[in-house]
Structures are given as structure tokens and as C-alpha cells.
Amino acid sequence: MEKISLDTNPDSNLYFELHKSKVEIILGLVQISHGMAEHKGRYSEFISFLNENGFHVAIYDHRGHGDRILESKIGYFGDEDGWDLVVGDLLAVHKETNRLFPNVSKILLGHSMGSWIALSALQQETLFDGVLLSGSTYPNSLDIMLQKILLKIEILRLSNKGYSTILHKIIFGGFNGKFKNTRT
């Protein structure tokens, strides 16, 4: 595995891990966009599986996740245009993998929040040969409106850099409800 730093802007500390397959015939490169409350380390077994089956893998932590949590600001994307910054990071990693492997098929895998980031990136550029979306949702208009109201209340209460246990419970509280042993 090699770490490749990218200078997208001064405060982004963006780097990605490139896990190269050692098989003779390379089938493609998979770029992984992880979900909310995740980090790149959760994909290590999957990366090994992809490598063993002929795929290089590029993976990085989104802003506010994993190695990119700055000053305990979990999930924080930025003061302004945070979503655009996260989408820009995905495209910057893609641009670099395209430079490194111009003749290899590029596949984007987005999971949960990462699928939304992937979809936003695809609205700007269609540079991938394939896209896999996992755990993606499409909330209805009422859900979006209620989420925005609750989010604004929590920002007023905690600031835009605060961590809301209320939102965490609403978003993730029911995920493991049907399982007895919920170690993840």
C-alpha cells in the first residue's frame, strides 16, 4: 500500500491509499467512497478481496472521518460549501488515479453517504467506466424538509461544528435494532 498526498486546498490534508493488486492481469481500479460515520480502515478485508481478484483500490477518508477528523470535529466538512469540498476530494482522487493508470477501467463504489457523494460527482463529470451504489436512499420531500429543520435547530444549539447525539440517535439508532449482538 502506498499513500499519495493531494494538494486540493491548504486545509484539506487529503491523501489516499493505493492498494495495488499483484495479479498478472489487472481488471480495473475501484475507488471507494465510504459511508457516514465510517472510515477507510473498515474496508481492509474488502480491499484484500478486490486485490486478490485483479483490482487496484484507491480509498481515502472523507473530511471529518477517520484520519481527517480535525480537532475532534467528527463529520465536519467545512465552514462553507462543505459538500462541494467533499465531492471535489472524490474527483481529485479520481483525477490522480486516472493519471497513474490511464488505460485501466475505473469503477466508483459509493456506500451510503458515499453513494450520495458519488452521485454528486457524477453530475459534474462522468469519468468512471462503472459505478456501484450500495446502501443508498432516496428520502421523500417531507423527510428532507424535517431533516433540514432539525439540522438548523442543532446548529443553533451546538454550532455548525458541534456533534449532535440527538441526530446520531435518529440517523443510526435503529440500524442494529433487530440484532442481539451489535458489535461492529
Predicted segment positions?
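Alpha/beta-hydrolase active-site loop
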Residues: 78-98
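Short beta-strand immediately N-terminal to the catalytic nucleophile in serine-hydrolase-like folds
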Residues: 108-110, 134
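Active-site glycine-rich loops that stabilize anionic/oxyanionic intermediates
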Residues: 27-38, 112
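Conserved alpha/beta-hydrolase
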Residues: 42, 47-73
